[in-house]
Amino acid sequence: MRDWGRGHIEIDWSPGYEGLFEWLGSASGSTVERFVAEIERRDGLEVARRRFREGPAHALIFPNLFLGETNIAIVQPVSVEECVHWHTPMFWTGVPEWNGRLLRMAEAGMGPASFLMPDDLIIAGRNQLGLHARTSPWLLLGRGLNRETTDADGRIVSHITDETTNRGFWRHLRSVMTEA
């Protein structure tokens, strides 16, 4: 978990990946071999292999651009009770054979609820109910406060189960809203 500041946050799933392209369903075959060779030639073996293992970003660019591995989403607030969630799969230039796979993955992952995982929809619904709670505070974001550290780049980092990213987003939103 990384809080980059100013509401920008990242969930780093890469420690859970060991092999190349695990984040893409362990893709293989001649198309993959050709793509790997081209990127290794362009970027060097070490950089290319790291990218293939780590996968794309899982991040929120404040206020509403979400990069969810192979999906791109924009959340457009309409009112306190409603928002529009636009999403599209990320397509790659130069490997059209993969774009069909990326589209199918987006359809499977994003589904009719427009969330990456069914659990996310449940969580969003519970958060919406929390907006109507008559108790204060209705939302607690303390998990992992004791594990947060600051890395050499000035980012607040913590364990994958911590709420560092939530705190970073809401901290910045509060500062922006109180300045308005």
Where are these regions (language model features)?
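C-terminal catalytic domain of Rieske-type non-heme iron oxygenases
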Residues: 1-180
